[in-house]
């Protein structure tokens, strides 16, 4: 064992003292190592005012990213279908090949993603629509952190609404689940289940 260790130490120290061998000096390798010189200082892939998000043209008017998002969200909240939005964007009667190259294609695909996300949504709060699994995970965190029903109803957008509006609200089931979890947590604590034993 000691011999192996000494052999490794000797090998490492030998390699540490060696100088690196120079690369072959062929015209090709010199060209590869030579710094690139060009008349341009930098290469810009986009201009500063170029649009980066989904934009669309509606009724002959070009909409910027913010306007596009606002319109798509409005259509989503009013329950518009993908075919009706496709028709509004002028893509309905086109072949798939034509539609893909149309200026409103990105807006339509964005709307489809928004629609799909909303369909899978259990509640809407925070950054937007949340899945059932994510919502229940957050509800458990809030219960264990000791958040009050008032705090959670505020987070879910239910605070200050009438009873009728709360019952009709899309986050009502999430709030009921929070109350159920809270009750179960209190029962567990009352039974000493959550106390650590050493």
Swiss-Prot record:
Cellular component GO terms, alphabetical: extracellular region; host cell nucleolus
Q: Can you say where in the cell this protein is located?
A: Secreted; Host nucleus; Host nucleus, Host nucleolus
Does this entry carry the keyword Ribonucleoprotein? no
What induces the gene encoding this protein?
Expression is up-regulated during the early plant infection stages.
Motif mapping: RxLR-dEER: 43-52
Regions annotated as coiled coil: none
What keywords would UniProt list here? Host nucleus, Secreted, Signal, Virulence
Q: Where is the signal peptide?
A: 1-20
Keyword DNA damage attributed:
no
Family per record: Belongs to the RxLR effector family.
Described by its record, this protein's role is as follows:
Secreted effector that promotes P.infestans colonization of plant host. Specifically suppresses Avr4/Cf4- and AvrPto/Pto-triggered cell death. Targets the potato MAP3Kbeta2 kinase, a positive regulator of cell death associated with plant immunity, and perturbs signaling pathways triggered by MAP3Kbeta2.
Quaternary data: Interacts with host MAP3Kbeta2 in the nucleoplasm.
Domain statement: The RxLR-dEER motif acts to carry the protein into the host cell cytoplasm through binding to cell surface phosphatidylinositol-3-phosphate.
Name used for this protein in its record: Secreted RxLR effector protein PITG_22926
Q: Name the species this protein comes from.
A: Phytophthora infestans (strain T30-4) (Potato late blight agent)
